[in-house]
Amino acid sequence: MTSAELRARFLKFFADRGHTVVASSSLVPVNDPTLLFTNAGMVQFKDVFLGREHRPYVRAASAQRCVRAGGKHNDLENVGYTARHHTFFEMLGNFSFGDYFKREAIVYAWEFLTEVLMLPPERLWITVYAEDKEAERIWLEEVGVDPGRFTRIATSDNFWSMGDTGPCGPCSEIFYDHGPSVAGGPPGTPEEDGDRYVEIWNLVFMQYERAGDGTLTPLPKPSVDTGMGLERLAAVMQRVRNNYDIDLFRNLVKAAAELAGTTDLAQSSLRVIADHIRSCAFLVTDGVLPSNEGRGYVLRRIIRRAIRHGYKLGIREPFFYKLVGPLCAEMGQAYPELVEARPRVEQVLDKEEERFAETLEQGMKILDVAIRDLGSPVISGDTAFQLYDTYGFPVDLTADVAREHGLQVDMAGFERAMEAQRERARAASHFSVDYSQEIHLDVACEFTGYRNAVEDTRIVALLRDGQAVDRLEAGEDGVVVLEKTPFYAESGGQVGDRGVIRSDSAVFEVADTRKQGSDLILHRGKLREGALLRGAVCRAEVEQSLRLATALNHSATHLLHAALRRVLGEHVTQKGSLVDPERLRFDFSHFEPVSPEQLDEIERLVNREIRRNAEVTAEVMAKDAAMRLGAMALFGEKYGDDVRVLRIGDFSTELCGGIHARRAGDIGLFKIVSESGVAAGVRRIEAVTGAAAVEAVEATERLLRRLAERMKAGRDTLEERLDQMFEKNRALERELERLKAKTAGAAGADLASRAVDIAGVKVLAARVDEADARMLRELVDQLKDRLGSAAIVLAAVEGGKVSLVAGVTRDQTGHIRAGDLVNSVATRIGGKGGGRPDLAQAGGNRPEELQGALDGVPEWVRRMLNA
């Protein structure tokens, strides 16, 4: 029975028994900061179990995609070395939300295994929590399980909890017995860690609420949460003991072997690659991109581990992305979203492999040398840190290589080096925060700014220097808290409103509006005239021109977000934003620079929607209803049961609490002014709207006019004239390079005659004026060819800066490394450098000491050669 057939039979079995089949949720948990990835079938139902969410069904079944890599649940280091560890797996599960309980859950499980899958009862072993007499009775008396294949477990292994407090309850586990030919004993015995008995299904009975003091109170509506690994079940049904021998993995392993040009399918590296393509492809499908933090860094670690195992198999060209096709063939029918995302997944994996390939070979050489020169079975933390910091090796990749050599990594030393780097970064940042402005007031403020920009209200608190006062005098800076306010407090990337607060005797200029907590709105500014009193009646007036400009930019940001997803793909999600009266800035997830053509299309889409002039509407509704509408939510934001949904026609739907235009046409015009990268996997677009956009277009027009005048060309011939100029420039550059090469050839012959012989190695250290770094490299390459066995350092000085290039012929790199050679000179002239063993570069800023440093090279080489 294939894995696909097993999945289908499981879901049909429970659908026939009144369960709603629910699609797998994303690997990125929605609004759950406690989890890095979805790691169990119950994750998408967590709020249902906790009573925070209600679904239109009380029975559910699912085949849930799961990842266990990074965080508390981390199987990464074991993948490839064991029969059953994976970074990605599918969990089959059936769930009851206050409907059926132990009896039905147990009977369903037994029926599915013994009647649908026809597993022999004598091959199954049951465990229950020792105190769960009800489950014990059902198994032994109603189901009729053999008491000789039944164990009571007294430990927490058979008692599940969601956390230190909350729902919890006993478990009942079902094991498959591979038979006496396999080592290992039944669960609950000292030999239980063997491979004979494999857990295939866990039935969790949520029947208690655990309080902070540990006491257990029965739940009014007990529930059921079960989980069964598809891969383990497939291994049982296909009569293999290793998950990597099931149909799904066999085909992926074969595909990886073809790329590696090997017929030995038992190599653990092939299994690693077959496992990792599943987790990586589905993570990218669900919007995760490689980066240096959080989920993105876990993805990067998995990708790089797979690439390293490809390198170990002898693969030197990008290969990992080529496995997305075979994966789609295996899993695309069950998960069509993978097939839909295939081009994007292949592109992301290919880009990441190209990026890592640049440093993989160098890093592996350094690691090989470190292992070869070890005097102990431990790779130093400093070496692991150098590989991480310089060559992009995640430390678990280094540990993986160490494990293959029977070695360990000094993790404590690695962490010390990491902490030292963090300290250097903190020391260099010089940021300071004034925490004295944290304000504690037992008051609330009602926001009325959606309806109007002016509000008659009352002052409920005044603060000066963070302290509550009854009065502010003219010229004093302070904070005003109002009973009601039309001022929007900075939130969701939109800056706070500015304006004035007027009383009969005072004018307070609001420079910024901030929120503290959920309902305290702080108006920060300066009292321009009069005296402001706590309790006074006043009028709050928002500066409407600034608000309108900000609102237009905010609505344009929503249009931009929607356009990005249409042009670049559904993986685009907001990573940050800034919306103020002058401009908008939008950070989003994407794996490469946005091309000029894509930027044009994005801008065209936004301006099309502006011309369509759709109404901008806001509606408060239940969060579930908003999600069903397809509203975009910001990951990491916490939303209540009711949310504000902002829609711009049928083009954009997002959860947003900000101030917006009334119609899309109010924006007028949208113009992108820049696109850049701000972090790995995060891009930034800055844009302007309205009058600022018109000014940007006019500025471009003025620039084009000036260029045309200087080129003595019309608008229609300007591009042609520029092409002619560039071609002429390229011809001149080629002629210059030819002359330089001719000069370098003559200089090379002269320099070669100045080399000295030290123990059979030609050594040359010379200054070559009027040469740039490129010419120095070409000269070094020429001299290596001319001199045979050689060690060379050439230097040039320009503008008080020294450039150095060192070269060593390959037959001598075992004795002399170019990086060490160039640094022997660079350190004496206030610089440093590095490079490959045969070629390295450096710089310095003390040209007056250069000649002395060059004169010392022959003696330095003599020491290296022990001559």
From Swiss-Prot:
Protein family membership: Belongs to the class-II aminoacyl-tRNA synthetase family.
A Pfam cross-reference name: tRNA-synt_2c
Primary residence: cytoplasm
NCBIfam families cross-referenced by the UniProt entry: alaS (TIGR00344)
Role description: Catalyzes the attachment of alanine to tRNA(Ala) in a two-step reaction: alanine is first activated by ATP to form Ala-AMP and then transferred to the acceptor end of tRNA(Ala). Also edits incorrectly charged Ser-tRNA(Ala) and Gly-tRNA(Ala) via its editing domain.
GO biological process: alanyl-tRNA aminoacylation; negative regulation of DNA-templated transcription
Enzyme Commission number(s) from the entry: 6.1.1.7
Chemical reaction(s) catalysed: tRNA(Ala) + L-alanine + ATP = L-alanyl-tRNA(Ala) + AMP + diphosphate
Places the protein is found: Cytoplasm
Binding locations of Zn(2+): H554, H558, C656, H660
Gene that this sequence comes from: alaS
GO MF entry, a single one: aminoacyl-tRNA deacylase activity
Gene3D superfamilies registered for this protein in UniProt: 2.40.30.130, 3.10.310.40, 3.30.54.20, 6.10.250.550, Bira Bifunctional Protein, Domain 2 (3.30.930.10), Threonyl-trna Synthetase, Chain A, domain 2 (3.30.980.10)
Cofactor: Zn(2+)
Matches recorded under HAMAP family: Ala_tRNA_synth_B
Name of the protein: Alanine--tRNA ligase
Organism: Methylococcus capsulatus (strain ATCC 33009 / NCIMB 11132 / Bath)
